A protein has these predicted regions:
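Patatin-like phospholipase
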Residues: 1-219
């Protein structure tokens, strides 16, 4: 972790690193044809630099030419990463305005929100509409540096995130450690029964022992 933080600290001193790692991820997973044809809406938050004015972008605002750029911009954690240029403007991470844009999701029509709170650096705004059901998912383990897009860190974070989500929805048991559903209760009952068995065995043996009465005197 120290090596990664050192790398990004040096990058910050040079004006920020390029988002090449995330750019490659987007190229790999983003199918623009399916994305724009899907009836599922999409929104992101980025921040204009240097004014720090928020820019809330919906799928209808995006084009095939700028979709990737806005996705990169929303994750351009300045000063570790360079701002992303779109047209004549520069944009940085949306966390400078709202790191968990629940209000934006509600404004787009969401009647239930699943919010993943990574506890990363950034602003978190108070939810205005308290009538919407919100389920929070928070990591129970150290995910490593949020600046890292290396495969090993990503795989580890995905695994932890899956486990944390399954625990929230009662599909797995545990807190920091993860167990199959019901295994904790079964193991507890097994150990409890075993403990009681040995206690009863010990007491039954003690009851059969013959003790010699000893009288103590002051002389």
């Amino acid at each position: 972790k120290e090596e990664i933080l050192g790398k990004y600290a040096k990058g910050a001193l040079k004006g920020g690193l390029e988002l090449s790692g995330l750019s490659q991820v987007i190229d790999k997973v983003l199918n623009k044809d399916k994305f724009f044809k899907s009836n599922i809406n999409y929104g992101l938050v980025t921040t204009h630099f240097p004014s720090l004015r928020p820019k809330l972008v919906k799928k209808d605002d995006l084009t095939e030419d700028d979709a990737k750029s806005y996705m990169l911009a929303s994750a351009s954690c300045f000063p570790a990463f360079k701002p992303t240029k779109i047209g004549k403007n520069l944009y940085i991470d949306g966390g400078y305005y709202d790191n968990m844009p629940i209000n934006f999701a509600i404004s787009m029509g969401a009647d239930e929100v699943i919010a993943v709170d990574l506890k990363a650096v950034g602003m978190v705004r108070e939810v205005k509409n308290q009538n919407v059901k919100i389920t929070y998912i928070t990591p129970k383990n150290d995910l490593g540096s949020f600046l890292a897009f290396e495969k090993d860190y990503s795989r580890k974070a995905i695994s932890f995130g899956y486990n944390d989500t399954m625990k929230v929805y009662k599909m797995l048991d545990g807190n920091i450690y993860t167990f199959k559903k019901g295994s904790l209760d079964r193991n507890y009952k097994r150990m409890h029964d075993k403990f009681n068995y040995y206690i009863d065995l010990f007491l039954s043996k003690v009851a059969k022992l013959k003790f010699k009465k000893i009288t103590l005197s002051d002389n």
